[in-house]
Amino acid sequence: MTEMRLTPLEIRGIAEAFVAARRGARPLAAFPVRLPNALDDSVAVQEEALRLTGERVAGWKVAMVPPPLRVPLAAERLAGPVDAATLIRCDADAIVEVAVYEGGFAAVEAEFVVVLGDEPRPRAEGFTAESIRDAVAWIHAGVEVASSPL
């Protein structure tokens, strides 16, 4: 089976639809254009949305790909940008209010937030657990309130 990759026009159309929905704080009735079936296309949509908004990336969220999607996407993990404007730093006893999309999707996830002090240095064999561990300055508990217009 040949996978149908998204065209540049489709990538832009998906990104524009999500950016407009987020800016208008309104849900989407369905996925715009068509659902990407390749991880590279999903990343391209994400990059186009960042370009359209001009948002600054504060960091990256690393997540596991659900087991049924690992073979089709040829990936076990993926990384997505954390928008600096949505990052809230607070004391442990603080009460924080965040908006979610009415009619969209929302979830709360516990996270480990890793702050790197130095850039990890790859070794001849690539990055190792030791080279990454040596670069870690802090590990914090975090909460992600994930919300999407879809």
Language model features by range: what are they?
Residues T2-L150:
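Catalytic-core "active-site belt" of small-molecule-metabolizing enzymes
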